[in-house]
Structures are given as C-alpha cells and as structure tokens.
C-alpha cells in the first residue's frame, strides 16, 4: 500500500551497514523524529549514525497526512484539568515552536517540499460548546486560537476552533533534503540493544548513547512501554481533482472526517480505532460515499492506512528511556500529531544528549506520573492486553512474537494485527509494523 508521499518523493538509497563501527550516538529509526534528532545532534558537533530497517521515511512518516500544527484535537481543555495549566502551556509552546522551526529550516536550507502556511480548524456539525471551551483554553495558554462560526468546508458547521500560522508539506521531500548530510544505513534492522552495543542483522555499532525513534520502542525491559501505550489505526483516501481548500480541517464529532489538500488533490481521513479491533463498517467504503456526495467530480487516486502510538495521558514520551538506562533516549507516543511532535522531540533530545536541560523535560518525561490523566486509559489498555494474551493460549492461535498475544486478521488492511500492542504482519507472516522484531511462521 503506497501513499501520495511515497509516490511523489524520491529519496536516494543508502547502503546497509557493513561490519562493526563506533560512534557517539546511534539513532534507531529513519523517520521524521529520528532524522531530525540526528540532524540537530550533528549541528551540535556530535558524530551520529542512523539505522533504518527499511528506507528513510518508509514507516509512519510516509503515511501521515503531514499537517504541521500545534492544534491537537480537543487537547488543551483536557490537559488543563488533568496535568495543570503550566504543563498544558509548556506542551502547547513546545509544539507551536516546532511548527515555527519547520518554517525556519525550510527557508534557511531552501527545501522544496510543497510547504504552505495554512490555518488549522477543529470543527463540529453537531455542537459548539466543547469547541468554545477548547478555544478559550488554547488562547489562555498562549496559542494562536480563536472560535469561528464559518469555515471553507463544503458543508455547514456549528463552529470551529481556528489556529493561525500552521502549515502543511510533503514530509518525504523534506526528509530527502534534511537527511542529505547524515550518515544513514538503510535495510539494517536492529535485533537487540545491550547497554552501549546496538546489534543489527548487518553488524554491531558501539555508541555512548542510543536513541529509540522507531515508532514503538521494542525493548520491553526496562521501560515497559508495552504497558503504557497502545496503537490506533486510521484511514486516508486520496481524491483528484478537488479545488484547494483554504485550511486544514479535523472533525471532533464521533463520526467525523479530516481534510487537507495537496495541489488539486484532497486527502480525506476517517475511522480511528484501536489496532487489532476492526470496525464494523469498511472505512474506505464510508469515505467513498462521503467523497461522492461532497466532491462528485473527484476520482480516487489512492488509499492507505496510518498507525499511531497513543500514550495513556495523551502526551508523548520524550526523554531518557528508563531510570536504569540513563544513556538510552526515546521519542514515541505522538498520537496523530507526528510532525510537530517529531520536531519537539528532536529539539528536546538533542539538548538533553548534549548535557543541557529544557523547560519541557518534565512534561514529556517517560518517567512522569499523571495518574489523573492516565487511570481510565490504563484500565482499558490493560483489559485489551489481558484478552489478547488469554486468546494466545487457545489451540490453533497465531501468536505475536512480541509478547504472545493472539493475532487477528484485518480484512480491510489485509494483514495480521496484534490487538495488545499493535504489531502488524503481511499475509505471509512478514513483519511490517512493531514493536515485534521478528516475522511469524508462514500462514496458509
């Protein structure tokens, strides 16, 4: 399954690792977070190596809708209640600075990536009260937010939260240029990490520090990320021709859609659900019906799925991997907001690795304890994991090599999925999504 980004951006191939090497920092993962972290570390004068199991940007970065925004759904009104006003303010500031940093980099290095400044909108066709609260919270926290009654969508809304000065781009075109001066080894899968040794299927690299930017951290102990994070799947339909929308849009109703343009194409998003729990309806069929109604002149040009890591309190894990591994670092749990979160993570981690502190360290710390924000999701995540593990003991079950949960078949995405932690496998058992690191035996 290919996306508009993988179809339109050509990133030069890099050679795999050969033999054993020594470096200051190893970054595991060649997506947006990993490449940006390596980029900033190199600017600090650090010798850094990036290891990518497939190709640069071939993971979730290649299947995003690529909105660069600090508007993360109805998050600020929630964070003010669960983690407090100051932590919510710092979360918003880190992401808004990330939005602005993309613009600075693209201008400074003359990166051709179809970058466009756009306002971002949260909309509802049912009510306006929760949008008013979100706009008030975001504005109170210093973000460029306001409540509006009208949008440029081809249907009437009850209201919307508008964030000005946000942006969109082609993420793989951006990665192509920003990674040009980095040492990246593609088609080099990390098998395990032991202290300061990163063992791959091509050789071993010894490093002073290790960064896990591989979407979902695959080392279970220490860290225990499998117990405090799960994955969600969503669906994207590419349509053409569609007149360019003025803005980027995300619905907040139970059955809502996202919209953004790319030239005369439109990316229509829909259908978020926990990976391994297939929806009752076919998301692509639903989107096709909506597209035929709203954009009758348009034809389908492509379709794909995205998969995102969700933390229990809604804030990414960025910082030291564990108290027991102070030289390991992690960037994960970006939710649906990988572009701004990747930049925020890169800035934070590059400072921490070079021995400096930032005002955002405590907010994003993987060792934080936001009990009020996490309790309900922890219970729900635990229940789903227990069910998956119990299913793995049944006769004839196809088990995930990560922790043994029973695999389920996603008939819409045509692949095997783990309902516990979100690993994915092609029909023949070949691994295509972590945290599992091995394929499963061939399935008839």
Predicted regions and their residues:
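Extreme N-terminal leader/targeting segments of oxidoreductases
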Residues: 1-25
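Helical element adjacent to the flavin cofactor pocket in flavoenzyme catalytic cores
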Residues: 137, 160-209, 213
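Rieske [2Fe-2S] iron-sulfur-binding domain
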Residues: 237, 393-444
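Glycine-rich FAD pyrophosphate-binding loop
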Residues: 43-63
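Flavin (FAD/FMN) cofactor-binding and adjacent substrate-gating region
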Residues: 2-8, 74-81, 103-174
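C-terminal catalytic lobe of FAD-dependent flavoproteins
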Residues: 253-254, 284-285, 295-378, 396
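Flavin-binding catalytic cores
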Residues: 242-245, 273-307
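N-terminal Rossmann-like FAD-binding beta1-loop-alpha1 element of flavoenzymes
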Residues: 23-50
């Amino acid at each position: 399954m290919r996306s508009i980004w993988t179809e339109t951006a050509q990133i030069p191939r890099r050679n795999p690792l050969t033999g054993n090497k020594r470096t200051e920092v190893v970054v595991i993962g060649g997506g947006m977070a990993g490449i940006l972290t390596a980029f900033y570390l190199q600017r600090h004068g650090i010798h850094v190596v990036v290891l990518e199991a497939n190709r640069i940007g071939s993971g979730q970065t290649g299947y995003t809708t690529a909105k660069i925004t600090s508007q993360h759904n109805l998050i600020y009104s929630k964070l003010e209640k669960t983690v407090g006003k100051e932590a919510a303010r710092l979360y918003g500031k880190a992401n808004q600075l990330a939005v602005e940093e993309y613009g600075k980099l693209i201008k400074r290095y003359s990166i051709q990536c179809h970058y466009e400044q756009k306002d971002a909108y949260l909309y509802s066709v049912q009510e306006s009260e929760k949008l008013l609260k979100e706009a008030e919270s975001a504005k109170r926290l210093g973000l460029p937010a306001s409540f509006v009654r009208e949008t440029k969508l081809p249907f009437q809304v009850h209201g919307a939260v508008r964030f000005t000065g946000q942006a969109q781009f082609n993420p793989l075109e951006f990665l192509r240029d920003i990674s040009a001066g980095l040492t990246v080894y593609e088609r080099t899968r990390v098998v395990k990490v032991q202290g300061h040794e990163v063992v791959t299927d091509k050789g071993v690299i010894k490093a002073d520090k290790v960064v896990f930017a591989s979407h979902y951290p695959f080392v279970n102990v220490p860290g225990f990320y499998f117990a405090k994070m799960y994955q969600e799947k969503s669906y994207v339909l590419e349509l053409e021709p569609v007149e360019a929308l003025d803005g980027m849009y995300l619905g907040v109703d139970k059955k809502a859609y996202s919209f953004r343009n790319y030239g005369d194409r439109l990316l229509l998003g829909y259908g978020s659900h926990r990976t391994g729990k297939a929806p009752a309806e076919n998301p692509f069929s639903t989107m096709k019906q909506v597209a035929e109604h709203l954009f009758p002149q348009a034809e389908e040009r492509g379709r794909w799925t995205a998969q995102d890591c969700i933390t229990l309190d809604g804030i990414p894990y960025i910082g030291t991997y564990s108290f027991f591994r102070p030289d390991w670092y992690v960037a994960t749990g970006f939710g649906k907001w990988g572009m701004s979160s990747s930049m925020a993570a890169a800035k934070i981690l590059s400072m921490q690795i070079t021995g400096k502190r930032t005002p955002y360290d405590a907010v994003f710390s993987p060792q934080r304890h936001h009990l009020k924000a996490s309790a309900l999701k922890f219970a729900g995540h635990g229940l789903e994991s227990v069910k998956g593990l119990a299913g793995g003991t049944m006769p004839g079950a196809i088990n995930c090599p990560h922790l043994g949960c029973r695999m389920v078949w996603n008939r819409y995405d045509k692949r095997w999925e783990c309902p516990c932690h979100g690993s994915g496998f092609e029909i023949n058992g070949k691994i295509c999504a972590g945290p599992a690191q091995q394929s499963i035996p061939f399935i008839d």
